[in-house]
């Protein structure tokens, strides 16, 4: 607003291309990356990462939400609206097919692993030991929203709510606001969150 220059953020160029593809009713869209396509894990962390040949739009959005960095979920929506396939290809070797993302695809046959570092585990409990139900959920998440704290995992019991959240400059302010609202809060820092889709016993033995 008011002539202020801004950007679309991470992967903004991909999103811009997706909007143009939507407007032009393109047959497909290609993005060029420094990897062979969409992989089932970050090869810098998991050396045995494998390429995924096909994904559907919803799986791609879920992976992006879980922390996969290759495609931003904003990029998918304009393509999904008109069922435009997205090809993720390596700029180092244009002959490789990469990964295709579209409305219908074959099931993913390899497990998908996403590791998010620098996480904070918050354990929240009402001081009167009352159940953590809808009203308290609303209070907790409205406070987290106020301080722009992104929640990546939720686990609740009768009196406790455990949240794995991204670390943030405002995390301590959010905790103080929760305490002022009548909650006890415990914080564990320097945590990691491993998300696994397609869990197997072999993966448990390897990474537990």
Describe each model-derived feature in a short phrase.
Residues 1-208:
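C-terminal catalytic "cap/lid" subdomain
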């Amino acid at each position: 607003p008011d002539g202020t220059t801004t950007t679309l953020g991470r992967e903004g160029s991909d999103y811009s291309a997706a909007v143009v593809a939507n407007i032009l009713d393109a047959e497909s869209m290609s993005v060029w990356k420094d990897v062979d396509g969409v992989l089932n894990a970050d090869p810098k962390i998991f050396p045995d990462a494998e390429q995924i040949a096909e994904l559907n739009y919803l799986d791609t959005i879920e992976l992006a939400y879980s922390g996969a960095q290759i495609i931003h979920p904003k990029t998918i929506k304009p393509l999904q609206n008109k069922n435009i396939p997205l090809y993720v290809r390596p700029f180092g070797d244009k002959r490789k097919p990469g990964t295709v993302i579209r409305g219908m695809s074959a099931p993913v046959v390899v497990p998908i692993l996403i590791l998010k570092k620098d996480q904070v585990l918050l354990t929240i409990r009402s001081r009167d030991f009352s159940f953590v139900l809808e009203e308290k959920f609303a209070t907790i998440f409205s406070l987290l929203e106020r301080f722009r704290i992104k929640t990546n995992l939720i686990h609740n019991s009768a009196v406790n709510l455990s949240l794995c959240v991204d670390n943030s400059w405002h995390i301590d302010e959010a905790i103080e606001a929760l305490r002022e609202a009548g909650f006890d809060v415990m914080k564990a820092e320097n945590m990691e969150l491993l998300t696994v889709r397609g869990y197997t016993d072999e993966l448990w033995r390897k990474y537990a």
